[in-house]
């Protein structure tokens, strides 16, 4: 008797599913949906002007539209210091954090092998200035023994200013005393610290400042400079970088490229249009400073440099590793910067 073959619908469904799975696996990553929002974290001052340009000129949105990503929402969130910025990135409240080289290295070290935070790009360089209204203080050693004097930094122990102060202490008194002045430091927003210095009569008598607050302090006649970060490191160094988590980068390759390209374009625009950039800063931040003063700051590369190239960052990494602030010693700056930066002649 002839054997009658039976149909197997279950097998057909399974085969179809397998074909779909193979097809899905072969789809390029760019074909998969990317996020429709980019959230930036920033802090205070002229160091963050490239972000203001990117947001004001809608550079990310324009690039995303050309890349076929549709409408992208771009938001900017302000924080008082590197510790708060890092926490916002870790908690998923922002996608990109703009912070000092110190906070970048702390987060790179903390997330290495897990979340893998690295820098998307460098934004800017400036000499951080330790200013004081205390006439007793002319040099670093004059701080020793003062019981009525506090030094304001954006984040105690974490901010780039806090790290530079430790570097200065090590340079002056040796490795065992790198933390000698840490008990004098307090966390404070730049505008609040400047207000304290200019008002006088408060416990905060020194401020490790950035532009424009350092300019306000020194031109007021009420404060003088003790040292700069360029003095401590022996030359210019990058100050602020933009960093993010590996997962966001891998999940949004086209949008990541748009963000990076936007910052490239913003820095090119600033350097080619410094007066217009100063005007944008004043309008965007609602600054009460005179436009002519902002133009002076933006126009002087010795005081305010906008550059994608990492400079002097390994000096921070080696120092922070030597005092135990980070556990992992990077072999080079490329360890904590994403590969899109690796063609830069960095350091």
Language-model features and meaning:
Residues 79-83, 98, 155-163, 191, ...:
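Soluble non-cytosolic domains of exported or imported proteins
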Residues 2-17:
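Bacterial N-terminal signal peptides that target proteins for export
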Residues 191-283:
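Pocket-lining segment of extracytoplasmic ligand-binding domains
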Residues 8-9, 22-31:
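C-terminal segment of classical bacterial N-terminal signal peptides
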Residues 49, 53, 83, 87, ...:
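Solvent-exposed, polar/charged alpha-helical surfaces in well-ordered, non-transmembrane soluble domains
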Residues 34-187, 201, 205-211, 235-236:
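Short, glycine-/small- and polar/acidic-enriched structural segments
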Residues 318-347:
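Conserved C-terminal helix/tail region of periplasmic/extracytoplasmic solute-binding proteins
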Residues 249-327:
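Secondary-structure end/capping motifs
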């Amino acid at each position: 008797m002839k054997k009658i073959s039976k149909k197997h619908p279950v097998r057909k469904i399974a085969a179809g599913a397998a074909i779909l799975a193979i097809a899905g696996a072969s789809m390029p990553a760019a074909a998969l949906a990317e996020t429709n929002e980019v959230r930036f974290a920033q802090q205070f001052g002229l160091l963050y002007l490239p972000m203001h340009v990117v947001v004001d000129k809608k550079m990310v949105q324009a690039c995303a539209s050309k890349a076929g990503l549709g409408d992208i929402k771009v938001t900017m969130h302000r924080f008082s210091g590197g510790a708060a910025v890092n926490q916002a990135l870790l908690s998923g409240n922002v996608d990109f954090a703009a912070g000092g080289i110190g906070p970048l290295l702390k987060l790179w070290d903390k997330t290495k092998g897990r979340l893998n935070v690295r820098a998307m790009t460098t934004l800017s360089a400036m000499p951080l200035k330790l200013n004081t209204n205390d006439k007793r203080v002319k040099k670093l050693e004059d701080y020793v023994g003062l019981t009525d004097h506090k030094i304001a930094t954006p984040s105690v122990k974490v901010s780039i200013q806090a790290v530079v102060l430790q570097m200065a202490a090590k340079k002056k008194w040796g490795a065992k005393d790198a933390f000698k002045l840490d008990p004098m430091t307090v966390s404070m927003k730049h505008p609040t610290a400047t207000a304290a210095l200019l008002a006088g009569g408060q416990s905060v008598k020194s401020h490790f400042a950035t532009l424009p607050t350092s300019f306000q302090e020194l031109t007021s006649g009420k404060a003088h400079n003790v040292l700069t970060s360029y003095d401590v490191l022996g030359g210019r160094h990058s100050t602020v970088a933009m960093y993010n988590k590996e997962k966001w980068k891998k999940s949004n390759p086209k949008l990541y490229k748009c963000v990076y390209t936007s910052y490239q374009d913003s820095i090119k625009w600033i350097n080619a249009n410094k007066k217009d950039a100063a005007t944008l800063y004043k309008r965007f931040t609602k600054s009460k400073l005179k436009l002519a003063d902002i133009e002076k700051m933006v126009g002087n590369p010795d005081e305010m440099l906008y550059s994608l190239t990492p400079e002097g960052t390994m000096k921070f990494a080696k120092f922070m590793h030597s005092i135990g602030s980070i556990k992992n010693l990077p072999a080079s700056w490329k360890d904590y910067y994403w590969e899109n930066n690796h063609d830069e002649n960095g350091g």
